[in-house]
């Protein structure tokens, strides 16, 4: 009988700690959910501004909303959209986001696979002549800030 009483006292102490752990986990879950919702809203918001002809997203929503470029559109924005879709909306990732990547490669590759700035209104490169320094800079930014994080998380590209 004494063993049962001691066991109950010990177990009640352990269960009190478990309740706190579950409360902490529930709070963390709510915060994670809020983060996922905000990231998903970010993707939805940017997709609403995609160029209707190409599906590509603009450099920004003010003075450069008419262009796509490697160092900003591709390097700083698109990877987070792709990762968010991969985590929160697999059909979006496997559909529109991969289509965007294919279109990007098709329309923006200027020197081999190295991309150059694309004009939505011209439906061609922004500059008539390639600028090697700009192309290398944009490509390096895209590789470093965009493609590397995607590859680290997603693995080999399709």
Language-model segments: which ranges?
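Hydrophobic h-region of N-terminal signal peptides that target proteins for export
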Residues: 8-16
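Glycan-recognition and catalytic cores of secretory/periplasmic carbohydrate-active enzymes
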Residues: 17-158
